């Protein structure tokens, strides 16, 4: 029996990783990288620059913030609607920065565009944090917006401004914002030292505010942010996450001491196989573990143990898996928009594989051993699934390959562009485009949708928003993955 239990996980792992899909024809990762970054230009809010490449988009929401006497123009729409949610926007910016920090050297000419994508986010976050003791965390009323189907250029729904402050704390969104600014300061350290210092100084101030005035922003702003980007996981992980990035960016002892002192209090070891805009636990442990593996910080050893636990928890074929894999090989987590989990967790696998390689280490996982090569193979399998190696034979990236989603849940993409239809298209008038069986008239190149369900089935239909809606935080970690595989299409 012992022999059988040892062999079966190995066979299952081999089947998931090495069975050649009959639908595979190899992938142009460089092209996919270019498109994954181009997607962010389709999500831009505010005054568009002269070098805007997706020409069907135009200026929008130029007066955002005016009702509160501030300028909050710019930034990104999070998904297929016209709201600017600060929590996922900050996480998107953090992950774009981490993608560049770890994999920018392999992005070639696309590195320049990736850096631009980061700066579009940080320029907005600097506006949102310009007043000490205040963070503007949302522009737009989600209920009003979701009751309409309008392109952003025509938007006439409520542009209500929401903020956190000392009396109405939000350590989660403030901690993530601090992380984003700190991570981006590393990206700009050599490219623009003055801008980098501004980002780091602001990150320091925002983190101090998040830490001193503790609380979840969904308690302060429940009716505005829930159920859309409610903090379901608590704010503790964002405080550790923000401190980890500030430590990496500043190398100040105070942040190291904060992390060590608060590891247990802020629950670094909780839900170690989760990572996304709401839950940073796995990301914290992988990020901090790099220093342990580089031999620089033995006092963080427990974070490496947590990171090893994360790795073992998501290996296909492990005895007690904490994630599921579809028959087609896709990593599946409960809830909607599954591709956000696929790209975020795959990013961590790839990042950790590189850290292990430099340290010449592996992760023992009971009957299996997670080598750096194995982790890269798992991550690459997920990327290849997204790009078309799946039972549907469908690329889940718009504009990549011959077959991809044509009816994505996205207002700007599905409603005729301003150049094609110059007159205003009103709130309810847009419903006919939402309900239309026709493909979207504007190609949101590079958008990765929520993806198939556990049976590998996908309805190419706008009303199925959990599967057909793209988000910025699906693409942000994918940029790093594609940056790596564009230069390393085979693993060793």
Curated annotation (Swiss-Prot):
<feature type="active site" description="Nucleophile">
    <location>
        <position position="81"/>
    </location>
</feature>
<dbReference type="GO" id="GO:0009507">
    <property type="term" value="C:chloroplast"/>
</dbReference>
<keyword id="KW-0119">Carbohydrate metabolism</keyword>
<dbReference type="GO" id="GO:0042547">
    <property type="term" value="P:cell wall modification involved in multidimensional cell growth"/>
</dbReference>
<comment type="function">
    <text>Required for cellulose formation of the cell wall.</text>
</comment>
<feature type="signal peptide">
    <location>
        <begin position="1"/>
        <end position="24"/>
    </location>
</feature>
<feature type="active site">
    <location>
        <position position="409"/>
    </location>
</feature>
<keyword id="KW-0326">Glycosidase</keyword>
<dbReference type="GO" id="GO:0005576">
    <property type="term" value="C:extracellular region"/>
</dbReference>
<dbReference type="InterPro" id="IPR008928">
    <property type="entry name" value="6-hairpin_glycosidase_sf"/>
</dbReference>
<feature type="active site">
    <location>
        <position position="469"/>
    </location>
</feature>
<dbReference type="Pfam" id="PF00759">
    <property type="entry name" value="Glyco_hydro_9"/>
</dbReference>
<dbReference type="InterPro" id="IPR001701">
    <property type="entry name" value="Glyco_hydro_9"/>
</dbReference>
<keyword id="KW-0961">Cell wall biogenesis/degradation</keyword>
<keyword id="KW-0732">Signal</keyword>
<keyword id="KW-0964">Secreted</keyword>
<dbReference type="InterPro" id="IPR012341">
    <property type="entry name" value="6hp_glycosidase-like_sf"/>
</dbReference>
<protein>
    <recommendedName>
        <fullName>Endoglucanase 8</fullName>
        <ecNumber>3.2.1.4</ecNumber>
    </recommendedName>
</protein>
<feature type="glycosylation site" description="N-linked (GlcNAc...) asparagine">
    <location>
        <position position="453"/>
    </location>
</feature>
<dbReference type="InterPro" id="IPR033126">
    <property type="entry name" value="Glyco_hydro_9_Asp/Glu_AS"/>
</dbReference>
<feature type="active site">
    <location>
        <position position="460"/>
    </location>
</feature>
<dbReference type="GO" id="GO:0008810">
    <property type="term" value="F:cellulase activity"/>
</dbReference>
<keyword id="KW-0325">Glycoprotein</keyword>
<comment type="similarity">
    <text>Belongs to the glycosyl hydrolase 9 (cellulase E) family.</text>
</comment>
<keyword id="KW-0136">Cellulose degradation</keyword>
<keyword id="KW-0378">Hydrolase</keyword>
<dbReference type="InterPro" id="IPR018221">
    <property type="entry name" value="Glyco_hydro_9_His_AS"/>
</dbReference>
<keyword id="KW-0624">Polysaccharide degradation</keyword>
<dbReference type="GO" id="GO:0030245">
    <property type="term" value="P:cellulose catabolic process"/>
</dbReference>
């Amino acid at each position: 029996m012992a022999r059988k239990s040892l062999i079966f996980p190995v066979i299952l792992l081999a089947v998931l990783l090495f069975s050649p899909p009959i639908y595979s024809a190899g992938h142009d990762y460089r092209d996919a990288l270019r498109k994954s970054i181009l997607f962010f230009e389709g999500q831009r809010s505010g005054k568009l620059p002269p070098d805007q490449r997706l020409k069907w988009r135009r200026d929008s929401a130029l007066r955002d913030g005016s009702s509160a006497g501030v300028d909050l123009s710019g930034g990104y729409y999070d998904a297929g609607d016209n709201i600017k949610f600060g929590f996922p926007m900050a996480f998107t910016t953090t992950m774009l920065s981490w993608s560049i920090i770890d994999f920018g050297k392999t992005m070639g000419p696309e590195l320049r565009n990736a850096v631009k994508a980061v700066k579009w986010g940080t320029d907005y976050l600097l506006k949102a944090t310009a007043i000490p003791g205040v963070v503007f965390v949302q522009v737009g009323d989600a209920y009003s917006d979701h009751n309409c189907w309008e392109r952003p250029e025509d938007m006439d729904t409520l542009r209500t401004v929401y903020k956190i402050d000392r009396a109405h704390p939000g350590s989660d969104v403030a901690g993530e914002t601090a992380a984003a600014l700190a991570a981006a300061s590393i990206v700009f350290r050599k490219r623009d030292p003055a801008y980098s210092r501004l980002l780091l100084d602001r990150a320091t101030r925002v983190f101090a505010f998040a830490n001193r005035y503790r609380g979840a922003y969904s308690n302060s702003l429940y009716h505005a942010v829930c159920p859309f980007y409610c903090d379901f996981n608590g704010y503790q992980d964002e405080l550790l996450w923000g401190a980890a990035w500030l430590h990496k960016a500043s190398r100040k002892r105070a942040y190291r001491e904060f992390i060590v002192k608060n590891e247990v209090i802020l629950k670094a070891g909780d839900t170690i196989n989760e990572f996304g805009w709401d839950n940073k636990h796995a990301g914290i442990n992988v990020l901090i573990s790099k220093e342990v593996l580089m031999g620089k910080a033995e006092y963080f050893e427990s974070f490496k143990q947590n990171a090893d636990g994360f790795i073992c928890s998501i290996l296909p074929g492990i005895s007690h898996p904490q994630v599921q894999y579809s028959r087609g090989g896709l990593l599946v987590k409960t809830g909607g928009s599954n591709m956000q989990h696929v790209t975020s967790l795959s990013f961590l696998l790839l990042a950790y594989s590189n850290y292990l390689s430099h340290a010449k280490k592996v992760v023992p996982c009971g009957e299996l051993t997670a080598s750096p090569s194995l982790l890269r193979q798992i991550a690459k399998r997920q990327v290849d699934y997204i790009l078309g190696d799946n039972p549907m034979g469908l690329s889940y990236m718009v504009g990549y390959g011959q077959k991809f989603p044509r009816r994505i849940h996205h207002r700007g993409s599905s409603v005729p562009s301003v150049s094609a239809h110059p007159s205003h298209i009103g709130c309810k008038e847009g419903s006919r485009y939402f309900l239309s069986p026709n493909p979207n008239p504007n190609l949101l190149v590079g958008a990765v949708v929520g993806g198939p369900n556990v049976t590998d089935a996908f309805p190419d239909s706008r009303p199925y928003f959990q599967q057909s809606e793209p988000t910025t935080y699906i693409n942000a970690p994918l940029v790093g993955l594609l940056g790596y595989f564009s230069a390393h299409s085979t693993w060793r």
